[in-house]
Swiss-Prot record:
Organism of this sequence: Polaromonas sp. (strain JS666 / ATCC BAA-500)
Protein name: Large ribosomal subunit protein bL32
Gene Ontology BP term (one): translation
Taxonomic superkingdom: Bacteria
Residues in coiled coil: none
GO cellular component assignments: large ribosomal subunit
Gene that specifies this protein: rpmF
Basic residues composition-biased segments: 9-19, 49-60
PANTHER family: 50S RIBOSOMAL PROTEIN L32, LARGE RIBOSOMAL SUBUNIT PROTEIN BL32
GO molecular function, one term: structural constituent of ribosome
Family: Belongs to the bacterial ribosomal protein bL32 family.
UniProt keyword terms in alphabetical order: Ribonucleoprotein, Ribosomal protein
A Pfam family annotated for this UniProt entry: Ribosomal_L32p
Claim: Ribosomal protein is one of the keywords in the record: yes
InterPro entries recorded: Ribosomal_bL32, Ribosomal_bL32_bact, Ribosomal_zn-bd
Length: 60
């Protein structure tokens, strides 16, 4: 098992953790329906960037 040779200082520990921050997922608002959805994903009603791209079960 690996064992550290020297104690990591609080400064180095903080630098090591600098990339561990959580990010907020990008939320977009559909222009035609006003619904929110994840960026680069279609909305629950089947719209993407103002166009109908998928038929929903209620329409089929």
């Amino acid at each position: 098992m690996a064992v550290q040779q020297n104690k990591k200082s609080p400064s180095k520990r903080g630098m090591h953790r600098s990339h561990n921050a959580l990010t907020v997922p990008g939320i977009a608002v559909e222009s035609t329906t006003g619904e929110t959805h994840l960026r680069h994903h279609i909305s629950p009603t089947g719209f993407y960037r103002g166009r109908k791209v998928l038929k929903t079960k209620s329409e089929a």
